[in-house]
Amino acid sequence: MSENNLLDRLDGLESRFEEISTLITDPAVIADMKRFTKLSKEYRDLEKIHTAGRDYRNLLANIEEAKHTMAKESDEELREMAREMLAEANERLPILEEEIKMLLIPANPEDDKNAIVEIRGGTGGDEAALFAGDLYRMYVKYCESKGWQVEVTDLSEGATGGYKEIVFSVKGEGVYGILKYESGVHRVQRVPATETQGRIHTSAATVAVLPEAEEVDVEINPADIEMQTSRSGGAGGQNVNKVETKVQLTHKPTGMVVVCQQARSQIANRELAMQMLRSKLYDIELSKHNEAIAARRKTMVSTGDRSAKIRTYNYPQGRVTDHRINMTVYNLSAVMDGEVQPFIDALIIAENVERMKEAAL
């Protein structure tokens, strides 16, 4: 993108930034929570571009000033200062241009949301459940390293350990935009503890990452919800098996069912179940959008296809391979201890390359 084209794009967004700056102080807009929330998010995104654009224009002005000084000034000391200024500005300019191009990539409104993560043991029986437990611990350690809050909302334990299924929410800054890359089939190759012949078995677990929908994202008619309660089999202190704290919600129009039993009270479980239901309904629409994106792109990065095999964990070789970007590391133990950031960083870069092409940047 040429310098003039970049300035034209920045000018257009600057006008929008000024418009929103006025709108978010309008009492009528403030009274409309859905509109105000949307505009506030757009304002925060455009503020970053506004700041970078200001720096870019100042840098271009410094370059012109330095060139003018070198052409017109006879004082050698001033000319030397201008040469240094020009060299610094020319070094900074392409870096700032790339930063602006990244900011100009259309923002994904879901990326700032919290997330709901579902891990299910797939093929492999007991070994798959154990691997699902390993993945859960991996994500908990990763989330702890980021300062995020993890809360289990539902689980079903495996016969020999691990989980047939575990569902948990993750709250923090930019959670969904990072964890979304983990959606898909994770495959493990290792010798199970019960294997006497030393043969390597292959098992799998499926990870689904959903953006946590807010009430402004999805409107649910209370008449469409059927609630059933029962005694919880999960953590609940003295209340376990004495009061009906377990909640099952059925969304009648879609037949979707969610269960929550980890909280200590029926009210808390109902709130968590409603949150999960909103997110699942929101995810249906988001999946349609992602399918349209996937049809345009050749890459599998972040399309959210949960049937796609995305990563293999090979224990005998200490190897982890991400098949979407053909990236392999030989530090499996560190990865299982939560060091998944290198994969996520590489996936973000790969997706941004595709998005920059789409945005003609």
Curated annotation (Swiss-Prot):
Keyword list, A-Z: Cytoplasm, Methylation, Protein biosynthesis
Gene3D superfamilies on file: 3.30.160.20, 3.30.70.1660, 6.10.140.1950
The record's account of how the chain is modified after translation: Methylated by PrmC. Methylation increases the termination efficiency of RF1.
Subcellular location: Cytoplasm
Pfam family, one: PCRF
Predominant place of localization: cytoplasm
Matches recorded under NCBIfam families: prfA (TIGR00019), PRK00591.1 (NF001859)
Family in the record: Belongs to the prokaryotic/mitochondrial release factor family.
UniProt protein name: Peptide chain release factor 1
